[in-house]
Amino acid sequence: MVSIRLPDGSVRQYEHPVTVAEVAASIGPGLAKAALGGKLDGELVDTSTVIDRDASLAIVTDKDADGLDIIRHSTAHLLAYAVKELYPEAQVTIGPVIDNGFYYDFAYNRPFTPEDLEKIEKRMQELAKKDEPVTRRVVSRDEAAGYFRSIGEKYKAEIIESIPQSDEIKLYSHGGFTDLCRGPHVPSTGKLKVFKLMKVAGAYWRGDSKNEQLQRIYGTAWTKKEDQDQYLHMLEEAEKRDHRKLGKQLDLFHMQEESPGMVFWHPKGWALWQQVEQYMRRRVNDAGYLEIKTPMIMDRSLWEASGHWQNYRENMFTTESEKRDYAIKPMNCPGHVQVFKHGLRSYRDLPLRYAEFGSCHRNEASGALHGLMRVRGFVQDDAHIFCTEDQFIAESIAFNTLAMSVYKDFGFEHIDIKLSLRPEQRAGTDETWDRAEQGLRDALTACGLTWQELPGEGAFYGPKIEYHIKDALGRSWQCGTLQLDMVLPERLGAEYVAEDNSRRRPVMLHRAIVGSMERFLGILIEHHAGAMPVWLAPFQAIVLNIAESQAEYAQSLAQTLQKQGVRVAADLRNEKISYKIREHTLEKVPYLLVVGDKERDAQTVAVRARGGVDLGVMPVEAFVERLQEDLRSFK
C-alpha cells in the first residue's frame, strides 16, 4: 500500500506503486491532461516517475513556476532536436534554462544566420505538433559515454566522462533524438506550444576562452501566447530604453577600447551624476553619517589581513613600487576600519557611521562588461556603521527607512527585499547567528516591510539584507545591501572600550543604497527612458530665441535663471525655431522657453513642457515658481 499526501492535506492510497501521471489521472482527467511533472517530497520529477513509498506529491502544471521551467528546459531539447535534423553535422553541448527562456550551445562549421533561425524555429513547431512522447532511461556512465561517442557527439561524451563512474546517467529521448539531462521534462512534445528563437551569440566550451568557440542560440518559451507577446514587447521597449543608446543620443557618456570597463562622462552625464551624488550626500549627512575619503591604493599586507589577497586577488588590479606590492581597492571596507582604529574608541563614540563615495576597481572579465551595468571602475555610495550589539537593530531600522525613502525619491515604488541566512560554512556561534538574523528580521518588521528568506545564502561572516528595485519594465535590480559582519573587525583589530573598561569588537554593518553609481545611473536612464525628473535633469530648461533680435533677451533670461539655481542654457543659433524645438525635445529637456518679440517686450516667456505640452506665456517669476514647486521636495 502506497499513501500519497496531496497539497490540500488529503491522502490517497494505492495498492501498488504508481506513477505521477497515474496519481494525476486518479484525481481527475483535467489534471491528468495538464500535468507536466510532479514535486515528490519537494523534488521535481517527471510524470513517468514511479512512486513506491509513502510520500507527499504536488502535480506540476503550466500554472506553476516549476511548470514553466520544465517547459523551457524541454524546449531547449526541442531546439537541439531540430538543429540535428536540419544540420546533422552540428554537435550538441549544453542547453539550460535561464531567466525568461533557455539557450543551447552548438559546435558547427559555419555561423548560424537569421535565416537558419527561422528554419530551425519552423522545424521545432513541426516536431512539437507531432506530440512525440518524451521517454527517460537510466544507464551507466560508461554506457552513456559509449553511446554518444558512437554517434560522434564528442562534447556530450566529454561531459559524461567527467562524471563519477558510480553515478547513474539519465538519457531523454523523443523521436530520433536522445540527450543527456537531469530532467525533468514534459511528457510529450505537444506540451510545447509557445516559443520563439531570439538570437545567436558566441560562447566558449565550458566557459573557458582557451577552448573552442561555440554558437549559442537563445530562445524564449511560455505557457500562453499573451505572456510571450508581453515579454517581446518588453524587450522592444528595453531596446528603446537601452542606456548605451540613450547615453549616445543624449550625449551623456561614452566608453572606448583603450579603457575597457571605464566611463568617459560628458558634461551632461556628469551633471546628472552630480545631482545623484549631491542628493545622496545630503541624505547621509542628514542621517548622521560622517563623510571620509580613503586611499585608492594600499599595501598588500592590509589586503592579506582583511582576507582579500587570499580570496579575491584574481579580481584585483595590483601594482609594484620600490619592491612593495600594492592593490587598487576593490572595496572600501578595510580602509574604513583603518579610520575607525585611528585613536582609541569608547562606547560613548558609538554608533560611528562613516560614508564614502569610494572609487573602486575590479578586474571583471572583458566578456562580462556591459555599458554602465558592468564596469571595472566604479564609485559606490559606501558606508560602514560601527556600533554595539545593543545598537545594531536601531541602526538597521534607520537604514531601512533611509533606503526606502531614497528609492521612492528616484521614482522606484516596488522594492523586493531578501534576507540571506547562515550558510553551512560560517564564522561565529549559532547563538550569535540567531541574534543577528532575528535582529535583521525585527528591523524589517519595525519598518512594516515584507521580505523573502534565503536559507544558506548569507556570507560566511554574517547575514545580509538585499534591496531589489523594480524598474518601469518590471525588471529587478539589486542595488542596496545591509551586511552584518562578524569577522572583519576581528581580522583588522578594530575595538572599542566598553562601559566596564573591557576591550570589545564593534558590530560592523556594511551598507549601500544605490551601490555602484555607474550602474545606478544606467538603471535610472532606462527606468525614465532618458526623460529624467526635473530635479535630476542635466538641463532643466533651454531658452530658445526665434530671431536674432531676441538673442540678448534670451541670454539675459538664461543668466537670470542661472542665478536662481536653475540648470539652464540658451540656444541662440541661427536656426528655425521648429528645428531647435525638435532637437531639444529629442534631448528630453523638461522645459523649453521660447522668446519672440512679444515675450521680449513684455518680459515674459512661452513655456513648453516635455511631451509637447504648451503651458502658455507667463512672467519669468511664474515659471521660476513652477520649477521650484517641482524641486521643493528635494531641497
Swiss-Prot record:
Its EC number is 6.1.1.3. One of its GO terms (molecular function) is threonine-tRNA ligase activity. InterPro entries: aa-tRNA-synt_IIb, aa-tRNA-synth_II, aa-tRNA-synth_II/BPL/LPL, Anticodon-bd, Anticodon-bd_dom_sf, Beta-grasp_dom_sf, TGS, TGS-like. Signal peptide: none annotated. The keyword Protein biosynthesis applies. It is an enzyme of class 6 (ligase). GO terms for cellular component: cytosol. The keyword Transcription does not apply. Residues 242-533 are annotated as: Catalytic. Keywords: Aminoacyl-tRNA synthetase, ATP-binding, Cytoplasm, Ligase, Metal-binding, Nucleotide-binding, Protein biosynthesis, RNA-binding, tRNA-binding, Zinc. Binds 1 zinc ion per subunit. One of its GO terms (biological process) is threonyl-tRNA aminoacylation. Pfam families: HGTP_anticodon, TGS, tRNA-synt_2b, tRNA_SAD. Its cofactor is Zn(2+). Residues 1-61 form the TGS domain. Its main location: cytoplasm. Zn(2+) binds at C333, H384, H510. It catalyses: tRNA(Thr) + L-threonine + ATP = L-threonyl-tRNA(Thr) + AMP + diphosphate + H(+). It is found in: Cytoplasm. HAMAP family: Thr_tRNA_synth. NCBIfam families: thrS. Catalyzes the attachment of threonine to tRNA(Thr) in a two-step reaction: L-threonine is first activated by ATP to form Thr-AMP and then transferred to the acceptor end of tRNA(Thr). Also edits incorrectly charged L-seryl-tRNA(Thr). Homodimer. Belongs to the class-II aminoacyl-tRNA synthetase family. This is Threonine--tRNA ligase. It comes from Burkholderia vietnamiensis (strain G4 / LMG 22486) (Burkholderia cepacia (strain R1808)).
